[in-house]
């Protein structure tokens, strides 16, 4: 997911996206623990996507306050 795509989302959509990514991260960790994970690089992708969503959500919240 690109940062420009994330910036286009509303605050509610960002919350939904964050919840979806956290759920995916949980499932990937579970697959890794049980040895079923095929694409281990997806864990890092999801982790960075979560960081992007959180960063942009925080920036949008700061813009509203300012």
Swiss-Prot record:
This protein's GO CC annotations: cytosolic large ribosomal subunit
PROSITE patterns xrefs: RIBOSOMAL_L29
SUPFAM superfamilies: Ribosomal protein L29 (L29p)
InterPro entries per the UniProt record, alphabetical: Ribosomal_protein_uL29, Ribosomal_uL29, Ribosomal_uL29_CS, Ribosomal_uL29_sf
GO biological process, one term: translation
Keyword Ribosomal protein: yes
One Pfam family it belongs to: Ribosomal_L29
Sorted UniProt keywords: Ribonucleoprotein, Ribosomal protein
GO terms for MF: structural constituent of ribosome
Origin superkingdom: Bacteria
HAMAP family: Ribosomal_uL29
NCBIfam families the record matches: L29 (TIGR00012)
PANTHER family, per database record: 60S RIBOSOMAL PROTEIN L35/50S RIBOSOMAL PROTEIN L29, LARGE RIBOSOMAL SUBUNIT PROTEIN UL29C
Family membership noted in the UniProt record: Belongs to the universal ribosomal protein uL29 family.
Record-given protein name: Large ribosomal subunit protein uL29
Taxonomic placement: Bacteria, Pseudomonadati, Pseudomonadota, Alphaproteobacteria, Hyphomicrobiales
Protein's gene: rpmC
């Amino acid at each position: 997911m690109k940062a420009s795509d994330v910036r286009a989302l509303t605050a509610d959509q960002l919350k939904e996206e964050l919840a979806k990514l956290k759920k995916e991260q949980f499932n990937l960790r579970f697959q890794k623990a049980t040895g079923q994970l095929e694409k281990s690089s997806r864990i890092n992708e999801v982790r960075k996507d979560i960081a992007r969503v959180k960063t942009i959500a925080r920036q949008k919240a700061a813009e509203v306050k300012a």
